[in-house]
């Protein structure tokens, strides 16, 4: 839908006159989120010359013109007590956006950087400032596995947590255990205003430490260092926001990042469901059918899933950032429940019985 919105705005067409058909895609990983200039330019040129125009690029050209990863320059600070209690963090970010904005930029800082950089820790204050700059690089969109700048945010908070542990002479795992949000404190609101719905971080880290025999590894590390041998042990814990859906927090081109599902049940008992997402190998056909089958009681094999054609798909913002099941899948569940409730009312009327 972002392709349609951008093409409509630049070429001067109304959106209902534009159709996007997407065939099977071999993976996405964030690099296919932006609407790159070549897409729009090819269509504009087609109008100018009055002939079909095809946009083709080889692998080398794609690497030169596609979105790039990282290139965030982050200065991070952490304040805490001598006994290891984190009190505050401060982040200053200089972000390279390339020569043009990509479609997901409005969501990049608030949802990616600001939601993650405060970490999984219980403290009161966090200050964040981000400046975006234009350079002569390709569009600085949602690059390969960047997930709205989550990677950079995790790196920043975890590095300064390690530095804090080193400064006060405390084990990095023990410092994290001391500062984790407690299980009984959920739901919990972060210093930047994000609500964490649930979690058990202490149990998660403890399970990982037990699996690798963390205490034994530390002893081995100490013995090796006595011999002049180097052995590093790294720990990283983070809470990632996924689902890219709540419209109050996520936005692309002012469209908001919701998704929809349309389900029709035929007299034969078979159903067809249409979505605005597009499978890139995740298996939407199975997942969505399972959700609908669970809600309606229709066998999975009797449910047809359709994606990839904007002429038939309901309005939605597509597949990326681990969002298809939380958004479109949730929409499928809600739509199926409405169908189920309607069917119960009709059946109750025809059979002259209670809906229950």
Where are the regions a protein language model picked out?
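Flexible glycine/proline-rich, aromatic-decorated loop/lid segments
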Residues: 95, 124-133, 178, 254-258, ...
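Glycine-rich loop/linker segments at domain edges
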Residues: 71-159, 250-258, 326
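Helix-loop-helix junctions that connect adjacent transmembrane helices in secondary transporters/permeases
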Residues: 1-11, 180-270, 290
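Acidic, glycine-rich active-site loops and adjacent beta-strand->loop/helix elements
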Residues: 1, 23-28, 57-67, 93-98, ...
């Amino acid at each position: 839908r972002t392709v349609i919105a951008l093409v409509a705005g630049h070429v001067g067409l109304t959106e209902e006159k534009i159709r996007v058909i997407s065939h099977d895609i071999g993976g996405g990983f964030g690099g296919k989120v932006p609407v790159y200039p070549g897409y729009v330019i090819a269509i504009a040129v087609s109008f100018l010359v009055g002939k079909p125009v095809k946009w083709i690029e080889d692998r080398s050209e794609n690497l030169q013109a596609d979105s790039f990863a990282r290139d965030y320059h982050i200065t991070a600070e952490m304040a805490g007590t001598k006994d290891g209690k984190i009190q505050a963090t401060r982040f200053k970010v200089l972000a390279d956006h390339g020569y043009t904005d990509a479609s997901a930029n409005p969501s990049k800082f608030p949802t990616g950087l600001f939601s993650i950089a405060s970490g999984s820790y219980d403290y009161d204050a966090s200050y964040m400032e981000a400046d975006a700059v234009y350079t002569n690089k390709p569009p600085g969109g949602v690059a390969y596995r960047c997930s709205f700048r989550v990677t950079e945010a995790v790196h920043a908070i975890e590095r300064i947590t390690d530095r804090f542990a080193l400064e006060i002479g405390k084990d990095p795992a023990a410092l994290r255990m001391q500062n984790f949000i407690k299980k009984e404190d959920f739901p919990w609101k972060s210093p930047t205003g994000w609500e964490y719905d649930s979690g058990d971080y202490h149990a998660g880290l403890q399970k990982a430490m037990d699996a690798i025999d963390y205490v034994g590894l530390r002893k081995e590390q100490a013995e090796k260092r006595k011999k002049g041998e180097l052995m590093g042990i790294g720990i990283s814990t983070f809470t990632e926001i996924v689902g890219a859906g709540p419209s109050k927090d996520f936005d692309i081109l002012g469209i908001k990042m919701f998704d929809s599902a349309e389900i029709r049940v035929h007299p034969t008992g078979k159903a067809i469901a249409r979505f605005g997402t597009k499978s890139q190998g995740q298996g939407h056909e199975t997942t969505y059918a399972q959700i609908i089958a669970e809600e309606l009681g229709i066998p999975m094999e009797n449910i047809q899933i359709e994606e990839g054609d904007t002429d038939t798909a309901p309005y939605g913002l597509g597949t990326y950032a681990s969002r298809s099941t939380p958004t479109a899948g949730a929409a499928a569940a809600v739509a199926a429940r409405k169908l189920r409730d309607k069917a119960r009312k009709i059946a109750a009327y025809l059979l002259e019985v209670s809906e229950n």
